[in-house]
Amino acid sequence: MSHTKNLKLILQSKKLSELPTHRKSINMTIPVRALRCPIWLWPTYDAQTIPWKKKKKSEQHELWASVYNRTIGKLQLNKLTFIDLCDCFLNPTLLSNLFAAFSGYYPIEVTIMSRKV
């Protein structure tokens, strides 16, 4: 398959214990080839559009990723790491590592969920 196909990345901030409430989301379409390079080189990435950027540096969040693959109907929920959420999108490897295992299947939807720890 072509590595130029787009993935829809859905970023959502949620309390895991109350999934229907307190939702902030941003939809981004990211070329698959961009997943193999540092996140600040992604052409669609705009730090100003990410509402979590304004969170206090001292706030620690538990970051989870829910990965749903339409092609094979697979749903995975992975605990990624304890990380400062306001910095996680500036980490050049976090999301690219997340996608590495799924980049052979199209399309996939990824939801990033967080909660304070």
Swiss-Prot record:
Top-rank taxon, per record: Eukaryota
Name of the molecule in the record: Uncharacterized protein C1921.04c
